[in-house]
Amino acid sequence: MCPQKLTISWFAIVLLVSPLMAMWELEKDVYVVEVDWTPDAPGETVNLTCDTPEEDDITWTSDQRHGVIGSGKTLTITVKEFLDAGQYTCHKGGETLSHSHLLLHKKENGIWSTEILKNFKNKTFLKCEAPNYSGRFTCSWLVQRNMDLKFNIKSSSSSPDSRAVTCGMASLSAEKVTLDQRDYEKYSVSCQEDVTCPTAEETLPIELALEARQQNKYENYSTSFFIRDIIKPDPPKNLQMKPLKNSQVEVSWEYPDSWSTPHSYFSLKFFVRIQRKKEKMKETEEGCNQKGAFLVEKTSTEVQCKGGNVCVQAQDRYYNSSCSKWACVPCRVRS
């Protein structure tokens, strides 16, 4: 039985929804300007105030334009294109006083832009997977160009009963992903639910938001899920082959070390098939029971195997989870 959740992490009450204004602060000295990207839109009026007690002889520059662009403690600009974004700096007598960095968040025909990330085949931008029910999971996303990118992923629910999650720093994976004959870079991040109870029924989903920055562009993406819906076990381990009569062999395996315990409660089922020579095993998202595979609910079975490999993959026994990758062992039967 799991202890009752008595405390609420500050991370659970972060409100990601933008205030009802054209400009809001993302972090210190960095602001997001929400811009209507339709051609006839007038742009957004933004006031920038120099952080100084000084009042006179203040000038402004922008890293997007040459020379002095304004004077006075407050600079009023119209933001309607990326040339209007970037860093604005106020000066006095050759001394830098303060600066503000503007990022653009584009909206066209009522839809926020989603240009930084590439969606996966199932039309989602964020793909999350958990190897067990511990509350630990990994989320990944794809980008076409790895240039001047920054990411921040966090809990997006404002409910006091929400499931608090802490995520690490996003990192670039060595894995390249090919979609529609184009190669994409893959980023991933590890997350952990702050308070977990693997045996409890999930009633509220985990809600996450990813903030993405590329040069002077800002976008955000969201996802929600139950841990049970993103389960993908690791492959079975320690596959062993025992020759029997003729071409018959007994293949055995063990649960992956990462899988939840006790196994009597968190049970796996397995799919077994023969991999012929030069045949490639396909990993599918839709289900485990591929053509030629058969179901095994224990950790051994007998098969006829005269060449190639015996391959095994795992799936949650009681819930239609994703399948593990295949684990294979050569037949190596005696002639």
From Swiss-Prot:
- Signal peptide span: 1-22
Q: Name one GO cellular component term.
A: membrane
Q: Does the keyword Membrane apply?
A: no
Q: Name one GO molecular function term.
A: cytokine activity
- Report the SS bond pairs: 50-90
Please list the residue ranges annotated as the Fibronectin type-III domain. 233-324
Q: Does the keyword Glycoprotein apply?
A: yes
- Where's the Ig-like C2-type domain? 23-106
Instruction: Give the main localization category.
Output: secreted
> What are the protein's UniProt keywords?
Cytokine, Disulfide bond, Glycoprotein, Immunoglobulin domain, Secreted, Signal
Q: Where in the cell is it found?
A: Secreted
Q: Which residues are glycosylated?
A: 47, 122, 132, 220
Task: Offer one Pfam family short name for this entry.
Answer: IL12p40_C
Example GO biological process term?
cell surface receptor signaling pathway via JAK-STAT
Could you describe the subunit structure of this protein?
A: Heterodimer with IL12A; disulfide-linked. The heterodimer is known as interleukin IL-12. Heterodimer with IL23A; disulfide-linked. The heterodimer is known as interleukin IL-23. Also secreted as a monomer. Interacts with NBR1; this interaction promotes IL-12 secretion.
Family the entry assigns: Belongs to the IL-12B family.
- Name of the protein in its database record: Interleukin-12 subunit beta
Q: What is the organism field in this record? A: Mus musculus (Mouse)
